Amino acid sequence: MAQYSAQFPHAKVLVLGDVMLDRYWFGATNRISPEAPVPVVRVKKHEERAGGAANVAMNIASLNVPVRLLGLTGDDEAGNALTGLLEKQKICCDFVKLSSHPTITKLRILSRHQQLLRLDFEENFNNVHSDNLLTKLESAVKNVGALILSDYGKGTLNDVQHMIRIARQAKVPVLIDPKGTDFERYRGATLLTPNMSEFEAVAGVCQSDEDIVEKGLKMIADYDLTALLITRSEKGMTLLRPNQPAFHLPTEAKEVYDVTGAGDTVISVLATALADGRTVEEACYLANVAAGIVVGKLGTSAVSTVELENAIHGRTVSGFGIMTENELKNAVKLAKERGEKIVMTNGCFDILHPGHVSYLENARKLGDRLIVAVNTDESVKRLKGETRPINDLASRMAVLAGLSSVDWLVAFDEDTPQRLIGEILPDLLVKGGDYKPEEIAGSKEVWANGGDVSVLNFENGCSTSNVIKKIRDLKD
């Protein structure tokens, strides 16, 4: 699959559907309320993310593809917050604002990576006339390569048949992630992407792959579809088209943390690839890879071109080994989204010895990922003298990359890694030796971000200087 690319230079996509604002409150739970038998959450931070059709648009924007988003919001603070989130990602928002309805908002309260409660703020848009949306659609659809109708059953797509006709008249493919059991309303769509539960709720229970194919082809004929992509969780995906063999794709997921927004990712990548002129098979392959990435994240999230490219070429989603600073920032961001604890240390590591190995193993045990920042040759020379380093940077990094305890390696050219640590902001900063925590470069930055700093002991008698001395003594 190496010929596949995660770059989509010719794609432009239009999204129309139920837009939402997802809010997350994070905090610690250490006691039960005296007022009722419920935990008390001391909220320490909060996040806002785009949900529903807005998350679809975010997924497309994360692939560096121009995207326009149509939808209904309230004329309120939540609507302004959602618009702000989207515009930061260069998404063109073209909303119809209603004073009669609030922006759909879902507030989730989490503690220790567990969701305790969800609060929904919404009123259905079923009684809202679609004239303004249809006018916007007629104008915008002429300039894109694909249209996504994102249906969450909130009423934005009340006039979905009219929307499908507008797109088909413009010869633009229409992709729909369906909601409910009334698939008749999606008649004439180019591609539907139901999950297995949604498919069986309409077609009936399937006992085998043959059942899925038979009932899926009947669904295509019944509703005048061009194709059907059924997402099947741990069994991957199945693409069905009339007069063509079924195209089965096994799952790409390694670990599943959260399926929130996975359907959004699938349809986003599908539409983007089709708008770029890819075949349906290639579009499905890329969507399947992207779904395997996004279920490894916490909450609604998007997949970047770097992640998709890595996964296509068999590299891990988070990446391992030697990285640039920007690659490391991205890997750390993804790991934190999965709730992983990031540990960071640094050093010259000129001649690797058992003391180094033991130290790095102990540091790795303190978290889920270990970053090792390594001084460049110029930096080592300034710190240790003109005769150092013995091994150049490439050699030192290559040896460290072979250790199972080390996840990520990055080089820095300054005398200390303070600036780098301030950019990465690990959860735990570790240093070996007899330092006081406040003396460690980067400690202030880590503490200011709510992280911790720890000092680990080195093994007695193990040092690079001792190794060099022994070698020189042998020569003498």
Swiss-Prot record:
Record region (Cytidylyltransferase): 344-476
GO cellular component entries: cytosol
Catalytic residues of the enzyme: 264
Database matches in SUPFAM superfamilies: Nucleotidylyl transferase, Ribokinase-like
Presence of the UniProt keyword Transferase in the record: yes
Enzyme class, broadest EC rank: transferase
Protein name, UniProt field: Bifunctional protein HldE
Gene: hldE
